Regions:
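Long, compositionally biased intrinsically disordered regulatory segments in eukaryotic proteins
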Residues: 1-105
Length: 105
């Protein structure tokens, strides 16, 4: 079986939205995405450009971005039933998961 990046991106993006919605509520997620759209990104695009999402979160939420990034990374790790590495940046977490998914295929 060949690694399907599109499917990976969709699964992780969906899981991130569901997890963050369960923590903060769907209205909060809509507000976060509205702010992120100002920077031409969205939580659903976390796998396509995690650094862009991270940068936008830091611009919008400043110190609160670290909290959101940890929650987003945790949601992504839960897809693979992995324990999150708390020291991972958001980009590192997505890259680690992408590598794992490629190895599993």
């Amino acid at each position: 079986m060949v690694f399907d990046e599109k499917v990976f991106n969709q699964r992780v993006g969906k899981a991130v939205l569901e997890h963050i919605s369960s923590l903060l509520g769907p209205t909060s997620v809509k507000v976060i995405n509205l702010y992120l759209k100002r920077y031409d990104t969205d939580l659903r695009l976390i796998c396509e450009d995690p650094q862009k999402v991270s940068d936008a979160l830091h611009i919008v939420f400043e110190d609160g971005a670290a909290f959101l990034e940890k929650k987003i990374a945790r949601a992504a790790y839960e897809i693979f039933n992995l324990t999150p590495n708390e020291s991972d940046s958001l980009r590192d977490a997505i890259e680690r998961l992408r590598n794992l998914a490629e190895d599993l295929e």
